[in-house]
From Swiss-Prot:
Protein name: Autophagy-related protein 18c
Locations listed in the record: Preautophagosomal structure membrane; Vacuole membrane
Family in the record: Belongs to the WD repeat PROPPIN family.
Stated role: The PI(3,5)P2 regulatory complex regulates both the synthesis and turnover of phosphatidylinositol 3,5-bisphosphate (PtdIns(3,5)P2). Required for autophagy.
């Protein structure tokens, strides 16, 4: 598989790319094609059949939208709250190919670079110094400044486009499916080290990293267990149970303080779990100076500690018989729950002050709160149908 990178001066002129809303566009309701959180979950992007829209979460408002004459995008990847986005065509009647990434500068209203491939792009991930393009069997890692190809990573079939990055400036970690079923490959670029984690017996369905890349949370296509790993040595630190029945996991989110984990699935419940691990210490990765921390010290910077300040996940009433009864009876179950529709995909993320934000492919936005001491059913604080908002910017 090869790729082509270009700096398309004059290829996509602003006037030919952006289009003011015509009367036909105003009459035709835009269809939601995709939703995606930005790196710190303060905003999310919605790809539509007409273009894309950007929403702020606290307070909730549409910050801007772009209507395009040639259809919409199936991938709209933000770079925190900056003016840079990665766009991949898709959706009804889109004229933009699904095999090309456009790097869009919204301040200049133009495409500043593009990446063309020979097969469909499954995902694009951004951090301030890297552009990562995910194909079904390969991942390309580029330097953001000069668009130089830095790494190529082979994976097993990856139709979901699974890949996640660290976002601290002093770490550079990438996690993706490995070459074997249930395997995850963790690249520590600063340490020039690869860690292979045998996470599940079934294929990987969902994964996420903490912002510093020290912790990895995973789920398989079975969808019953979520596991948390140390990315340095592959140690499993904790395992929690979503349920007994098979489920399709849509999202896994870790709170910034690494005390909570949220999971959404096709079962119509968003689960919150209490984590017993937290990050202690810092690493010293620098993109200029390379790895300033030894592998041993880096590994020691992550310790599994019991936190006395938060509640614990409930276990089975028969957990006293662990070792005698099956593993199920010693499982940790969710600490708090919120119920949504089972007929559409929902993606959860943590907000401030023990809140969770949930966005759905039906155009719904929920904000709910959970009790960090007692757990239980979460309370709904806000509901908005963001595709039908009247207060446009």
């Amino acid at each position: 598989m090869s790729s082509t990178v270009s700096n398309p001066q004059g290829i996509l002129q602003p006037g030919s790319f952006l289009l003011p809303e015509s009367e036909s566009m105003k009459k035709e309701e835009a269809e939601l094609v995709s939703v995606c959180w930005n790196q710190d979950s303060s905003c999310f992007a919605a790809g539509t059949s007409h273009g894309f829209r950007i929403y702020n979460c606290e307070p909730f408002k549409e910050t801007f939208r772009r209507e395009l004459k040639d259809g919409g995008f199936k991938i709209v990847e933000m770079l925190f709250r900056s003016n840079i986005l990665a766009l991949v065509g898709g959706g009804p009647n889109s004229q933009y190919p699904s095999s090309k990434v456009l790097i869009w500068d919204d301040h200049q209203s133009r495409c500043i670079s593009e990446f063309a491939f020979r097969s469909e792009i499954r995902a694009v991930k951004l951090r301030r110094d890297r552009i990562v393009v995910v194909l079904e069997h390969k991942i390309y890692v580029y330097n953001f400044m000069d668009l130089r190809l830095l790494h190529q990573i082979e994976t097993q079939a990856n139709p979901r486009g699974l890949c996640c990055l660290s976002h601290h400036s002093n770490t550079s970690v990438l996690a993706c499916p490995g070459l074997n079923r249930g395997e995850i490959r963790v690249e520590h670029f600063g340490l020039n080290m690869v860690q292979i984690i045998n996470a599940h017996d079934s294929s990987i369905a969902c994964m996420t990293l903490t912002l510093d890349g020290l912790l990895l949370a995973t789920a398989s296509t079975k969808g019953t267990l979520i596991r948390i790993f140390n990315t340095m040595d592959g140690t499993r630190l904790q395992e929690v149970r979503r349920g007994v029945d098979r489920a399709d996991i849509y999202s896994i989110a870790l709170s910034p303080n690494v005390q909570w984990l949220a999971v959404s699935s096709d079962k119509g419940t968003v689960h919150i779990f209490s984590l017993r691990v937290r990050v202690v210490g810092e690493d010293s990765y620098s993109t200029e100076n390379g790895a300033l921390l030894t592998q041993q010290n880096y590994s020691n910077s992550l310790q599994g500690l019991v936190s006395p300040t938060i509640g614990t996940n409930p276990g089975s009433s028969l957990s006293f018989m662990r070792g005698v009864l099956p593993k199920y009876f010693s499982s940790e179950w969710s600490y708090a729950q919120f119920h949504v529709s089972e007929v559409t995909q929902f993606f959860a993320a943590f907000g401030s002050n023990n809140t969770v934000a949930i966005i759905g492919m039906d155009g719904s936005f929920y904000r709910c709160s959970f009790d960090p001491v007692n757990g239980g059913e979460m309370g709904q604080l806000e509901y908005i149908h963001f595709m039908k908002m009247d207060n446009r910017p």
